[in-house]
Every structure is written in C-alpha cells, then in structure tokens.
A protein has these predicted regions:
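Peripheral peptide segments
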Residues: 1-165
Length: 165
C-alpha cells in the first residue's frame, strides 16, 4: 500500500499557457501534469512551488512568467527557501486550514520538483520541524514519469483494496 503524504509540493514548469490561469492549469508540461495527477489521485493537499511566487495555492490565478530558481541572484535564491517554508507554515496555521494537526513533526511533505528546488528545500523544511523528502531525487525525466505511472497505479490498487474492507 502507498503511504499518502500530508502535502505535496510540485515544481512549476517551463511550459505554460500564454494567458492568466489558475496555477493548477498554467503549467502544461508532461512532468507537471504527471505530478499534479498523482497528487489529485492521492487526495492529498498540494501546492505549486515557483521561483517567482514561492508557494502557490493551485487555484491562485497568475500570469505566465519566465523565472527559474537557477536564474535568481545568489541572495534571492538563499532567501527563497525560508520564504517558501514560512508560507507553508502560514498555510497550515491558518484557522480555516485544511489540516487539523498543527504539529509540524506529523506533517509529511513530498517534494516533486527539480534538484535545484528540492534538495535545499528538503533541508529547510526539516530544520523547521517537518518530515520532508524528495522521492524522485536524482532521477531523470523519463524515470520520473515511470515513477509517477507506477505510483498512480499503486494508489488505485490501494483504493480498491480499501473499498473491500
């Protein structure tokens, strides 16, 4: 059975629509779509992480842009990771929050993004008290797509099995 994380953070993508759209729809690349599909099938809360905007709720409408984490200055890049962590804590601590357990140690976060985003973000989130990991670390795009296909099947099987009990 596949464990479902509390939250998935999904890296944005280079391929985008050309008009303002909700973050969930703005990014059109196959890797983003595979990540989004997994999060939605798992039924877990998910956000987009963006070099320009930080943490994005999927329904937040934004305009297309061309900013990457590697394109940020050294200072801006260093500041980005704690900003995203703070935004995530704010989302969890919001009184109308989706998540009842405010103990960060019990919040499991999966980061599905490129190494430039994920490796340092895992460290920053763990330092803040979260349980965070990057399940597709060091995998190329093809292997990541395979991972998402297999994991989606596992989620489907888990749901079928759960329905029989």
């Amino acid at each position: 059975m596949t464990e479902i994380p509390s939250i998935m953070l999904i890296g944005c993508g280079r391929s985008k629509l050309q008009e303002q759209s909700p973050a969930r729809d703005l990014y059109t690349g196959s890797l983003f779509r595979a990540r989004r599909s997994l999060a939605e099938e798992m039924g877990c809360r998910w956000f987009v992480i963006s070099a320009k905007h930080g943490l994005l709720y999927p329904d937040r409408v934004i305009a297309p842009y061309d900013v990457t984490i590697d394109g940020l200055s050294v200072l801006d890049r260093a500041a980005w990771f704690p900003v995203v962590t703070s935004q995530l804590i704010d989302a969890i601590e919001d009184p109308g929050c989706f998540y009842d357990d405010r103990d960060l140690r019990r919040v499991t976060i999966e980061i599905h993004a490129g190494e430039s985003y994920a490796s340092r973000l895992v460290e920053t989130l763990r330092a803040a008290g979260f349980t965070a990991f990057h399940p597709v670390a060091n995998l190329g795009q093809g292997k990541q797509m395979e991972y998402y296909a297999v994991r989606r099947r596992q989620v489907g099987y888990s749901r079928i099995g759960a329905g029989r009990t």
